[in-house]
Amino acid sequence: MVKNKGLGRGLSSLLGEEVLPIESEIVQIINIDKIKPNENQPRKHFEYNKIKELADSILNNGLLQPIIIDNNFQIIVGERRWRACKLAKVLEIPVIIKNFDTRESMEVALIENIQRTDLTVMEEARGFKYLVENFNYTVEKLAERLGKSRSHIANLLRLNNLPQSIQDKLNENILSMGHARCLINHEYAEEIADHIINHDLNVRQTEALVRQWHKNEYKKSSNNNNKVDKLCVKDNVIDNDLELLVKALSKKFGIKITIDNCRLGGKLMFHYKNLEELDLILSKLN
């Protein structure tokens, strides 16, 4: 079954907008099982709830916009819609077949998908890397083609140098891009990342942490697990508020209490002489 349908401007509107067919393009209805996803598209994670919402809409209203595929029936644009149709158990869907070879299809699919606003940082970064390595794009050419700043593209490309564990934390929003940029090409990036998470450091604190890492404030553990421990470097001056706090706490608990105030956190220590004093501390804490 073949029919004409005028829905828009075609692939000339590829960058930054939804791709719609022009008057001369032919919309075909084909079996959904013949269509293949594009393994090189940057988006790797599809939220089930959003796909389900789209599937429900398709069940109620039909698929209003055709999927664009190449001669091999590989998706160029529209994988979310294809997945939603599969979920909705739609058997046949409208498509537009573009006369692209494999290389052209791959490039167009990458460019189109990178323009999406809902890609994760690392999905976008990997898409940039693939275009640079396989299609001879430069940072300048990518910036011009995608309408993004050169600094944005250069910064994201550098994220590909991070260890996989940190890339995963970026994708899961455990670390921000600001945190991750501080760790690029650092010998102890993974250990510092764990420290950032465990101590809930902001980006400015992370920058300070990275600057101080090799200045005897941090050291390897004596065991062989390559864990990095934080050495507490005390501030030269303990302000009056902390001194008053130490005195007040010592008086309240009737024991010696000290505070080690470090540049990135600190320690509050209760000193007891025997188990009876420990029991007394615990009872007052309760």
UniProtKB/Swiss-Prot annotation:
The organism's place on the tree of life at top rank: Bacteria
SMART domains: ParB
Keyword DNA-binding found: yes
SUPFAM superfamilies: KorB DNA-binding domain-like (SSF109709), ParB/Sulfiredoxin (SSF110849)
Gene Ontology biological-process annotations: chromosome segregation; positive regulation of sporulation resulting in formation of a cellular spore
UniProt keywords, alphabetically: Chromosome partition, DNA-binding
GO cellular component, as recorded: chromosome
A GO molecular function held by the record: DNA binding
CDD domains: SPO0J_N (cd16393)
One Pfam entry name: ParBc
Family: Belongs to the ParB family.
NCBIfam families, sorted: parB_part
Role description: Involved in chromosome partition. Localize to both poles of the predivisional cell following completion of DNA replication. Binds to the DNA origin of replication.
Name under which the protein is recorded: Probable chromosome-partitioning protein ParB
Source organism of the structure: Rickettsia prowazekii (strain Madrid E)
